[in-house]
Every structure is written in C-alpha cells, then in structure tokens.
C-alpha cells in the first residue's frame, strides 16, 4: 500500500486513519524552539463528514486512502438508496442516504455530480457547484419591487429554500450556488 510522509501533506490529500478514509482540510508545519517538529492537521472523515484535529511527528508516514473521485449521473431514488450511473461504463451503483446527505436538496434526475468511491461503495456525493432550478413556491412579487433591498424565500423544485429578490415569481428558473445556497441570477433561456 502507498504511504505519504508528513512533508507531503497538503490540502485535499486522501489518507487512512483508524481504518477510515480521511481528506486533509488544513495542514500546518510547526517547528518549536525546543523539541521535534510536527504537523498540525485538520482532517475530514469521508464517511461521516466529521472534522478532527490530529498531529503527526515530522517524518511519520501515513497510509494513502484508496478512494476514487469520479463524475457520475444521478438516476433515481427508492425507499432506501439513491442510484448513480458511470456515464462511460453505464454501471449503476447505489448510495445510502448518509452518503448523499446535503446534496439531496440540489439533485434532479439526470444531473452530473462528483462521487467518492471507497471499496466500490459510494461514501460521498457532491452536487455541481452551480445548478439551474425552477421556483415552485414563493410569495407573489408586488409592483415596485426592485432587485435592491430585501428578498424573500423561494422553494425550488428539489425542495431547497433559497433567498431571492422580490421581483421573481413562481415558474421562474434561477441559477444557484450549491456550496453556499445563494441566488446568483436568472437562468439564461
């Protein structure tokens, strides 16, 4: 199995700790005036999403996580699982609700998303950074409403609630940043 030395640590590197795959979020090299140098890292568990702080002695080596990140197409959902397809091989893989997590409120059937595979199981799903969705419920816009000031909540076709300008109505298609949940503008039709 491949290993990484602490001097190879950088953000985004996938490593194994305590039998689970983790990704390094932050890495800081610390060289105290007295004593051995070490790396202070923040790591995110790819299965649960929890973030931990760990320290590693300088020169220590850690096993590399055998994870694969790939683009897959979301197909459908049943009672227990979400199903994704590899667009090159047409292989379909199920994902548990825990793996989909917050991506659920942005996904529509046929959407391309980034999926992390570990032991041929989907452990994490990331929606596209920007999506275009139709507004299915919002308060009606009134005369004199402008894009400046305020805003109102709007429910999208996937169930996500986004704060939008007052002039938007039911049926309008908008562009949203899925990382922050922010309204970016009307969709170009």
UniProtKB/Swiss-Prot annotation:
One GO BP annotation is: peptide biosynthetic process
Q: Which residues carry this modification: N6-(3,6-diaminohexanoyl)-5-hydroxylysine?
A: 34
Which Gene3D superfamilies does the record cross-reference, listed alphabetically?
2.30.30.30, Nucleic acid-binding proteins
Question: What Gene Ontology molecular function terms does this protein carry?
Answer: translation elongation factor activity
The subcellular localization recorded is: Cytoplasm
Q: Would the keyword Cytoplasm turn up in this protein's UniProt record? A: yes
Q: Which Gene Ontology cellular-component terms appear in the entry?
A: cytoplasm
- UniProt PTM: May be beta-lysylated on the epsilon-amino group of Lys-34 by the combined action of EpmA and EpmB, and then hydroxylated on the C5 position of the same residue by EpmC (if this protein is present). Lysylation is critical for the stimulatory effect of EF-P on peptide-bond formation. The lysylation moiety may extend toward the peptidyltransferase center and stabilize the terminal 3-CCA end of the tRNA. Hydroxylation of the C5 position on Lys-34 may allow additional potential stabilizing hydrogen-bond interactions with the P-tRNA.
Q: Which InterPro entries match?
A: Elong-fact-P_C, NA-bd_OB-fold, Rib_uL2_dom2, Transl_elong_fac_P/YeiP, Transl_elong_KOW-like, Transl_elong_P/YeiP_cen, Transl_elong_P/YeiP_CS, Transl_elongation_fac_P
Pathway annotation from the record: Protein biosynthesis; polypeptide chain elongation
- Domain of life, per UniProt, equals Bacteria
Q: Which UniProt keywords apply?
A: Cytoplasm, Elongation factor, Hydroxylation, Protein biosynthesis
Q: Which family does it belong to?
A: Belongs to the elongation factor P family.
What is known about what this protein does?
Involved in peptide bond synthesis. Alleviates ribosome stalling that occurs when 3 or more consecutive Pro residues or the sequence PPG is present in a protein, possibly by augmenting the peptidyl transferase activity of the ribosome. Modification of Lys-34 is required for alleviation.
- Protein name, entry field: Elongation factor P
Species annotation: Dichelobacter nodosus (strain VCS1703A)
């Amino acid at each position: 199995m491949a290993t990484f030395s602490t001097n190879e640590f950088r953000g985004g590197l996938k490593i194994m700790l305590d039998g689970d795959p983790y990704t390094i979020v932050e890495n800081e090299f610390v060289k105290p005036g007295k004593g051995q140098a070490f790396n202070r890292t923040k790591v995110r568990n790819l299965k649960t999403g929890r973030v931990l702080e760990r320290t590693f002695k300088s020169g220590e080596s850690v096993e590399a996580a055998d994870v694969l990140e790939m683009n897959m197409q979301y197909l459908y959902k049943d009672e227990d699982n979400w199903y994704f397809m590899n667009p090159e091989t047409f292989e379909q893989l199920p994902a548990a609700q825990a793996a989909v997590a917050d991506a659920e409120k942005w996904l529509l059937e046929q959407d391309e998303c980034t999926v992390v595979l570990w032991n041929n199981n989907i452990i994490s799903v990331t929606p596209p950074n920007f999506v275009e969705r139709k507004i299915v419920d919002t308060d009606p816009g009134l005369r004199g409403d402008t894009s400046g000031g305020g805003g109102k909540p709007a429910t999208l076709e996937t169930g996500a609630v986004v704060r939008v300008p007052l002039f938007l109505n039911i049926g309008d298609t908008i562009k949203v940043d899925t990382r922050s949940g922010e309204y970016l503008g009307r969709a170009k039709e």
